[in-house]
Design a protein with these regions (language model features):
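Conserved small-residue
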Residues: 22-30, 43, 50-53, 57-58, ...
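Short, low-complexity, disordered segments immediately C-terminal to signal peptides
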Residues: 61-78
């Protein structure tokens, strides 16, 4: 998600258009008995005891690691109790808030730039000029823009996945969007709402998507290998296959794929995830705004169901980058595909269904550069922020937790039909077919008493029928394609913009960042126990910011520590706020050393289980500080208690009380600021090497709010008078120790 993003002609945030008008209320530490590499990658793995696996790939999807747990053996006499592990302790002094155009880390740490917008990832590609004149034909072999969620996959000498590797790996990262001002000589060339320079649009096609790059540690320094055979870009022109219940249905038929079996590209890839067989999941978030659909001319050609779906997903604009306006079109429709209006005689003559081909979780095999990515439709279509893998247990289903990143949207989970078999480690896309194409999709209802229920999204249950008043569901494909409408019907709880998800490997608790909301989406009379605050976060210039502009983090524990359970308990782990705010706003008692706003990226370390990293994507507190990264040591659901807070709408002389459940205040021992980024950036995406001694962090869109290409407000990372660039930094501890401890 991008807080400081561009707006349309009406001042509407292109990445933050709420469309929910429903009446709904609002693998642990390195295992001692690790499999041998021989077993891990294909011989005898089915008889394994345990094997370390990545979960939630880096930043909400992150490299939190869980063991594969075998079926329980017969009871045996209880052994003598093991010594209690030494509690984790944050081992750095908090970094002060900052408005400087630099990356600030604690004393004793070094942050080095690793991978910047435009950097070449193939032999023979010239260094990036960063002046808008690089050959557009080379951009499919360059780093994309707006670096986001990422995962580190360790690689062994046999070029296979080795989660413990600390010196060589594949860094796989999303490129969410673009800052077009800095991509061309003088920004985008637009004449009366029409893009007139096709080469500019070609650049932009390639700068979205995903990078796969090989990285290596040489001495104490990390670098990426420009000519690695693993290096790959996946972008808006990459062919993708559909799998799952929506594949090869009428909903996905287009001129490009007349049988609905494939499409091109992925974009607005925000958070991410991983699988226990060693593939990467990238998640399509704010995709709807890229499509052109003019309501005044297209609505009359659509059915009532289509109009309901368009309204719920926000497909009604000229297209945020105006890609559909380029003429002439290419023979294969590279520009025309972004026009989702009815033009031809049937769906196979145009791209009227083009919008349905986005909004999915996409699986990519980083170890096979020639493999075709797959859009896994069983996980539902919405504004996917991430897909965080839950605890992995042999003989049990796999579970992924997901947020829908828009105001008043929902939290979901997918439970596979097939039970996990460790023999599938290294199984690539075929393993994905087995576990991700058939399962149960659920949405969360948070009740006012601190409990909750998972509601299944399935035709014929939970009001998801052909008789639902807002939308007549027809079949299983209709349900997953219109998952938001299905969740409305089921009665899910509207949340304050669900973002990244992360699972604590020590407790199994699931954390979800709710980055913020405004007064229009969450007025004082519409708060709930799980979204309890309404307040005015006044800036230092006394500007009012109403609603819940600072956000919070909710967490829940599935019943009986079973991710497949249909009930859970919840509380609010952390309320973001200025340290100077009132007690009814600063409910987590934050201080100058750990106050924050708009939590977004989130990831649990696998090298130090229980260590949580939090990243911000903020526009509310940027009068005081740039966005930041914090380290935390959270407890567990229920470590605090019930609380009654007082919300105030001073402008309308309204005061209301709201019950909620607040986690234990973290204090500076349990939460402190670790890094502050450069001007106008977002901190997003995080991963670590197999030993936890290198931390990879993404700095997205520094200087995005610049008004002029010749006078940017940031020059990071290259300095001088250069244009700013999104980039990955690698952080190491000068004494070689674990990061953060």
């Amino acid at each position: 998600m991008t807080a400081n993003t561009r707006t349309d002609a009406h001042g509407v945030d292109l990445d933050d258009v709420g469309t929910n008008d429903s009446p709904n209320p609002s693998f642990t530490d390195l295992v001692a008995s690790r499999l041998s590499r021989r077993h891990l990658f294909g011989l005898g793995v089915g008889t394994a005891g345990t094997a370390l696996l990545q979960a939630c790939g880096g930043g909400g999807g992150g490299g939190a690691a869980f063991p594969i747990i075998p079926p329980a053996p017969a009871p045996a006499p209880a052994p003598a109790p093991a010594p209690s592990p030494t509690p984790l302790k944050l081992g750095f002094n908090p970094v002060a808030k900052s408005l400087a155009d630099v990356v600030t880390v604690p004393a004793g740490y070094t942050a080095s730039v690793l991978y910047r917008l435009g950097d070449p990832i193939a032999a023979g590609v010239a260094p990036y000029k960063n002046d808008g004149t690089d050959d557009p034909a080379t951009y499919d072999r360059r780093a994309g823009d707006h670096h986001d969620g990422m995962t580190f996959f360790g690689v062994n000498a046999a070029n296979k996945w080795d989660p413990a590797n600390a010196t060589r790996g594949l860094l796989v990262m999303n490129h969410e969007a673009i800052t077009p001002l800095f991509l061309h000589p003088n920004g985008q060339t637009v004449d009366a709402g029409v893009r007139t320079v096709a080469e500019e649009v070609q650049r932009e096609f390639y700068l979205h998507g995903v990078s796969v790059i090989e990285v290596n540690k040489n001495g104490n320094a990390w670098s990426y290998k420009q000519d690695s055979s693993f290096n790959r870009r996946v972008h808006t022109l990459t062919e993708m296959q559909f799998s799952g219940p929506a594949a090869k249905t009428d909903y996905l038929k287009t001129k490009y794929s007349t049988d609905g079996s494939k499409t091109r590209g992925t974009l607005n890839n925000c958070a991410n995830g991983t699988t226990p067989w060693g593939t990467y999941l990238t998640c399509e978030e704010n995709w709807a705004g890229y499509f052109r659909r003019i309501k005044g001319t297209d609505d009359s050609k659509r059915s009532a169901k289509e109009l309901a779906s368009f309204g719920r997903y926000g497909v009604a604009s000229t297209g945020r980058e105006l890609w559909a306006t380029v003429t002439p079109d290419t023979a294969d429709g590279q520009y025309g595909r972004w026009n989702t209006e009815v033009i031809g005689a049937s769906a196979t003559d145009d791209y009227r269904n083009g919008h349905n081909t986005y909004g999915w979780v996409v699986e990519i095999d980083p170890f096979n550069p020639t493999s075709t990515p797959k859009k896994r439709t069983a996980l539902g279509r919405f504004g996917h922020e991430g897909a965080c893998l839950g605890p992995v247990v042999v003989g049990k289903p796999l579970v992924w937790y997901m947020g829908d990143d828009s105001r008043n949207e929902y939290i979901y989970k997918f439970v596979s039909t097939r039970n996990w078999d460790a023999a599938d480690i290294g199984g690539g896309m075929a393993a994905g077919d087995k576990y991700m194409d058939d399962g149960r999709l659920y949405v969360a209802r948070f009740d006012e008493d601190g409990t909750g229920v998972w509601l299944e999204l399935k035709l014929g249950v939970n009001n998801i029928t052909s008789n639902y008043e807002k939308y007549a569901f027809a079949d299983a494909a209709d349900v997953v394609i219109n998952a938001r409408l299905a969740a409305d019907a089921a009665g899910a709880t509207k949340m304050d913009r669900p973002e990244w998800t992360a699972v604590n490997p020590k407790t199994g608790d699931v954390y979800v960042t709710l980055t913020n909301t405004n007064a229009a989406s969450r007025p004082i009379g519409k708060t709930s126990a799980s979204n309890p605050r309404y307040y005015d976060d006044k800036t230092t210039a006394n500007k009012s910011q109403l609603g819940n502009p600072n956000g919070h983090i909710v967490r829940f524990a599935d019943e009986n520590a079973d991710p497949t359970s249909l009930r859970f308990k919840w509380d609010v782990y952390l309320f973001a706020a200025r340290s100077t705010a009132s007690a009814d706003v600063n409910l987590s008692q934050l201080t100058a050393d750990n106050d924050l706003s708009s939590p977004d990226g989130m990831w649990f370390s696998h090298a130090a289980p229980g260590l949580l990293w939090l990243q911000t994507d903020d526009g509310a507190y940027t009068d005081v500080t740039n966005c930041m990264l914090l380290a935390a040591l959270p407890g567990k659901v229920g470590d605090g208690g019930a609380k009654v807070i007082t919300n105030v709408d001073a402008a309308n002389s309204i005061t209301r009380t709201q019950n909620t459940f607040v986690g234990k205040a973290p204090g500076t021992e349990g939460l402190r600021r670790f890094l502050v980024g450069p001007v106008d950036c977002e901190l997003t995406g995080i991963a670590e090497s197999g030993d936890g001694r290198a931390l990879f962090v993404n700095i997205q869109h520094p200087g995005e709010g610049s008004g002029s290409v010749t006078a940017p407000i940031s020059h990071w990372p290259d300095g001088g008078t250069s244009r700013p660039r999104s980039a990955t930094v690698v952080i190491t501890k000068n004494d070689g120790g674990l990061i953060g401890l």
